[in-house]
Swiss-Prot record:
EC category name: transferase
Any single Pfam family the record assigns to this protein: RrnaAD
Name of protein: Ribosomal RNA small subunit methyltransferase A
Positions of S-adenosyl-L-methionine binding: N27, L29, G54, E75, D101, N122
Keyword vocabulary terms for this entry: Cytoplasm, Methyltransferase, RNA-binding, rRNA processing, S-adenosyl-L-methionine, Transferase
Gene Ontology MF terms: 16S rRNA (adenine(1518)-N(6)/adenine(1519)-N(6))-dimethyltransferase activity; RNA binding
Subcellular location: Cytoplasm
The protein's Enzyme Commission number: 2.1.1.182
Reactions it catalyzes: adenosine(1518)/adenosine(1519) in 16S rRNA + 4 S-adenosyl-L-methionine = N(6)-dimethyladenosine(1518)/N(6)-dimethyladenosine(1519) in 16S rRNA + 4 S-adenosyl-L-homocysteine + 4 H(+)
């Protein structure tokens, strides 16, 4: 049963010869019930602006539009543009298609006025983590978006929501924990995709904090990169490239500890000590 009167996705993909490309990190979702479930995680979308990255043939796009959203979809794969144009014609004035690379997109310029958009996407696996890092480190803060509802490989999702002293805790968990509140909403099995990935996927819902701890985003990015770049080493070793001895002395943090034991607050303290040293 179609959610919108448009042809089934399998038919669309066959008609436009849209076999997923591994080089673009593509894994298409065919089940419109599942894409509708993802869209619902973003909240009430009626008349709300939404940014979608990597729509492919438009399965999630259709679910977002069916729930009343105004969607701006950014697609790098030109093969998908005709299929997306058919959806655009079905929802006049509700879908804006941008052909290009999301990593080069100025997202804050897409919605200069009106309510902040929500980002809802089944992100291409090969750029998903980098896009999230860009959105977490964006300036100014609060950011250009009001929330993010994103699909990742399960392992990446666990890194986003990880806490200190856990196996998945790392740079991504620190940056996400600093500026946002995040949770894993639900898992999606490999067989839901074409082609099926080798791992479980998860949908993560992320809400920006209005007032995160004061800290320079670039400094925190550099500190976490150094600390977790050699995560099994003591901080006095891993932080050497960023003046670790002085940072540890200023903050009173024990240099024999390892990065995965530090709280977000302790990383913020290191970053704030790092700025005057630079």
């Amino acid at each position: 049963m179609s959610i919108d009167g448009l042809p089934p996705l399998r038919e669309v993909i066959e008609r436009h010869d849209l076999m997923p490309k591994k080089s673009l990190g593509q894994n298409f979702l065919f089940d419109l019930n599942l894409t509708s479930k993802i869209a619902r995680q973003a909240g009430n979308l009626q008349d709300q602006p939404v940014i979608e990255v990597g729509p492919g043939p438009g399965g999630l796009t259709r679910a977002l539009l069916a729930q009343g959203a105004y969607v701006t979809a950014i697609e790098r794969d030109e093969r998908c543009l005709d299929a997306l144009a058919e959806i655009e014609a079905h929802y006049p004035g509700r879908l804006r298609i941008i052909s290009g690379d999301a990593l080069e997109q100025d997202f804050s310029a897409l919605f200069p006025d009106g309510p902040k958009p929500r980002i809802v996407a089944n992100l291409p696996y090969n750029v998903g983590t980098q896009l999230l890092l860009n959105w977490l480190l964006v300036e100014p803060w609060p950011p250009f978006y009001s929330s993010m509802t994103l699909m990742f490989q399960r392992e990446v999702a666990e890194r986003i929501v990880a806490t200190p002293d856990s196996d998945h805790y790392g740079r991504l968990g620190v940056l996400a924990g600093w500026r946002t509140v995040s949770k894993i909403s639900f898992d999606v099995p490999p067989q839901a995709f074409t082609p099926p990935p080798k791992v479980m996927s998860s949908v993560v819902h992320i809400i920006p904090r209005e007032n995160p701890l004061p800290c320079n985003a670039n400094a925190l990015g550099q500190i976490t990169q150094a600390a977790f770049g050699q995560r099994r080493k003591m901080l006095r070793q891993s932080l050497k490239p960023v003046g670790g001895a002085e940072l540890l002395e200023k903050t009173g943090i024990d240099g024999t500890r390892r990065a995965e034991t530090l709280s977000v607050e302790e990383f913020v303290a290191l970053a704030n000590a790092y700025r005057p040293i630079k």
